[in-house]
Amino acid sequence: MSKIAFLFPGQGSQFIGMGKELYEQVPAAKRLFDEADETLETKLSSLIFEGDAEELTLTYNAQPALLTTSIAVLEKFKESGITPDFTAGHSLGEYSALVAAGALSFKDAVYTVRKRGEFMNEAVPAGEGAMAAILGMDAEALKQVTDKVTEEGNLVQLANLNCPGQIVISGTAKGVELASELAKENGAKRAIPLEVSGPFHSELMKPAAEKLKEVLDACDIKDADVPVISNVSADVMTEKADIKEKLIEQLYSPVRFEESINKLIAEGVTTFIEIGPGKVLSGLVKKVNRRLKTIAVSDPETIELAIQTLKEENDNA
């Protein structure tokens, strides 16, 4: 069988009702949701299954909710005996990838991402930061735009390098507005403001990163059993000291997702399994290289289908 990477989604993929079937049908998944409730001392599971969508979207709720659901999907998928050669995640998804790789316990991870969400929320007063997706412009040209705007006194930088022609910028509200206009003047097809609560993956998140360091200091981070591709370096991380450092840097650094996928391709990965709600990452992978095989698993039905497909492929190999 060709090499497999497990990918884990980030914020934005959440929806009310995600993981509910797993909770009802898979004892290991139910234990995870119960453990999340206990660790966070709140009924996170009730919010996920039947809560208010706006409340679930709040950064400090969305992050533990997505992590819990992704790991619940993983628990069911693991029953198949299919194991990854690599794991990776998009922003918050990196924590799920580290749990999957044995570097972080679920309990430590769910607590940490709850605090991470709170710190990100507190870092910049509401309305002062912004993010926007810039379509149809390469990273080098867009970086010249953001550097120019920043030099003129309005901080803005590249935040998510998702796939060819799709880059998210982040910074002060004014910086993002000016960079969006300048990008369009310089050939970008579109600039789409994003509905987010803060300027994530920008220098403005440094106060949050300092607080996050204290939380990570208290975590029992281990060396990873499976290589994890870091958002910050787009390269392999396995050592616990490196993992901790990268998680802190990740808050104020760009997510180099396109480069991460290219790194996985270079390592021989041809099958990408997106584990958790939605199909956002599968779409991005296809935009990096449409010949790659992507499978998105999020509930008992899609998990069974994926297992069947992979086993048939293996039998035919």
Swiss-Prot record:
Please tell me one Gene Ontology term that the record gives under cellular component: cytosol
> What residue ranges are annotated as transmembrane?
none
Q: Which organism is it from?
A: Bacillus subtilis (strain 168)
Give the residues annotated as active site: S91, H201
State the name under which the record lists this protein: Malonyl CoA-acyl carrier protein transacylase
Q: What class of enzyme is it?
A: transferase
What gene name does this entry carry?
Answer: fabD
Gene Ontology BP terms: fatty acid biosynthetic process
Its recorded reaction(s) are: holo-[ACP] + malonyl-CoA = malonyl-[ACP] + CoA
Q: Which UniProt keywords apply?
A: Acyltransferase, Fatty acid biosynthesis, Fatty acid metabolism, Lipid biosynthesis, Lipid metabolism, Transferase
Q: Which NCBIfam families match?
A: fabD
A Pfam family cross-referenced in the UniProt record is: Acyl_transf_1
The UniProt entry's sequence similarity note says:
Belongs to the FabD family.
